[in-house]
Amino acid sequence: EGKAIGLAKPRMDST
């Protein structure tokens, strides 16, 4: 799920 979230919202994951 982590990858899916990162691809969907890389800004939130990166931040």
UniProtKB/Swiss-Prot annotation:
UniProt entry keywords in alphabetical sequence: Cell wall, Secreted
Name the UniProt record assigns to this protein: 65 kDa cell wall protein
Main location as per UniProt: secreted
Compartmental location: Secreted, Cell wall
GO cellular component: extracellular region
